[in-house]
């Protein structure tokens, strides 16, 4: 299987004591060729960093983590919101709106990228991502 790792999973791994279930799941499933990150996830993380006060002591290490540990190491595995994903996004947003269940645009972008590349989303936020037929797995649950 091929996986699209969501923001909450990447953030969990940065903790001093990451959730043991997440670490165990990743150890069992990680193969560098089968794990991807969406450009939307990069944007979400960068947004969180930039919201911090420039003097906040967390800002510099978070920026270094994002630019070095994520973008530099996994740059080839970062998937853009490209034309195929944009078409999927338009379809799933229209379907969700028509059904009376509008979806947050960024979550829908991640779902669209996963669908465009036939990926399983790895997230804690299953209810936020479990729509439009995308497969979702929660590594936080045992």
Segments and roles (model prediction):
Residues 1-40, 50-67, 142:
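Short, well-structured N-terminal submotif of metal-dependent ribonuclease cores
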Residues 1, 111-142:
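Acidic, PIN/NYN-like endoribonuclease modules and their adjacent C-terminal/linker elements
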Residues 47-53, 72-120:
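Active-site neighborhoods of divalent-metal-dependent phosphate/nucleic-acid chemistry enzymes
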């Amino acid at each position: 299987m091929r996986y699209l790792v969501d923001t909450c999973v990447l953030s969990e791994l940065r903790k001093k004591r990451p959730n043991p279930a997440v670490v165990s799941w990743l150890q069992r499933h990680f193969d560098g060729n089968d794990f991807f990150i969406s450009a939307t996830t990069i944007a979400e993380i960068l947004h969180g960093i930039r919201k911090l006060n420039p003097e906040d002591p967390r800002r510099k290490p978070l920026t270094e983590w994002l630019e070095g540990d994520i973008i530099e190491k996994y740059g080839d595995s970062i998937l853009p919101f490209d034309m195929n994903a944009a078409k999927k996004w338009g379809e799933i947003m229209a379907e969700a709106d028509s059904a009376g269940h509008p979806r947050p645009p960024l979550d829908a972008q991640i779902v669209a990228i996963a669908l465009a590349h036939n990926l399983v989303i790895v997230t804690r936020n299953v209810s936020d991502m479990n729509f439009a037929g995308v497969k979702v797995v929660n590594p936080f649950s045992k």
